[in-house]
Amino acid sequence: TIAGMIGMAVLYYFNFAPAWSVIVVNAILASFLHELEHDLIHSLYFRETSVEKMMMWGVWMFRVNTPSPFYRKKIHLLHHKESGQLSDIEEQMIGNGMKWGLTRIVVMLDQGLAFLINSRRVGKTAPKLSKAEMAKAAFPFTYIYQATSLLFINGNLYLLLMPLFNAGFVAPAWLVQMITVVNFLAVVIGLPNFIRQGCLQIVSSSMHYFGDVNPDGTVGVLEQCQVMTARSWYMLPFQLFCFNFGSTHAIHHFIVNQPFYLRQLGAGYSHAAMKKYGVRFDDHGSFARANRYHPASPALLPAGEGSLS
C-alpha cells in the first residue's frame, strides 16, 4: 500500500497522473493503511516484535494527520472495554454524543480542532484522558501536517489574491518554490489523508451509539454499533474512503481479533447473525438523537457546549 502511494506520487511528479487521480487513489490506499493499523493495534501480526513496531511507524508516516498508533492502541482498547460510555475517549473526541451542527462537523473533519474543542470536556468524563499525553502523541507528524496545511491554504490564497490588489505584484522566487513543494505534498499525502480521515470519522461517529449504551458488555455489545449497508446510500461516498467501515466495523465489536480482510469477506454471514440477535441496521434516526440508542434518552452533548446537560 505504501509502495502504491509512493508510486502515485512519482507518476504525479513526472506529470503522468493528474492531481485529482492521485488524491483519490492515495486516499483509498491510505484507508487500507488504517485497517492495517487497526489490526496492528490488536496485535494480529508479528506480536511484540521489531517488525510490528516498524509497521506501526510506517502506517503512521503515511497517515500523517493521526496520533501515534502506539497511543491510539491505548484509547482504542479502552473503546472496546467501555464503548458508548462517558469514559470512551476515542469516540467522544470525534463527535459522538454531540448534536449535529457546525461544531460537530468541525470536530469530525479536523483532528487538531477536535482536540482544542473537545479535550477539556472529555477530560471531565473520561479520567483516563491525559491532554498532555494526547498532545505528545501527535508529535511529529500531525504537527507537520497541520503546519503544512496552513501553508497550503494561506500561501495559495496569498498568491491568488495579491494580484487583485496590486497589478504589479510579483511573488518572491523563494515563496513560489516553497508553495510548489507544499502543493506537491498536499496532493500526494495531505489531501488524501484529509479526505480519508474525514470520511472515516463521519462514518464512525455516525454508526456508534453513545451515552445510553448498556454498560454490561454481554448486552451492551448489541447496542454499541449499527450496521450501515447500501440502504444508507448517503454514506456510500464516505464508505469508499474508509474501506466500507460502516458496514463491517460492528462485526469487529463481536469478533475483535479478526483481520480486516476476513471481516470483509465474511460480512454477509456476520450480518445475518447480527440481525438475528437484534443489532440495528441503517438506523437513520440516530443522527437526530445525537448517537443515543434509545429514542427517549436525553441529549447528552449539545453542539457548541462544553459540559453535559
Where in the sequence are the language-model features?
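Short alpha-helical catalytic segment bearing the HExxH-like zincin motif
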Residues: A27-L36, S205, F245-A250
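A cytosolic-side transmembrane-helix exit/cap motif
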Residues: H38-F46, I202-H208
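Juxtamembrane helix-capping/reentrant segments at transmembrane boundaries
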Residues: Y45-V64, I89-W100, G217-M235
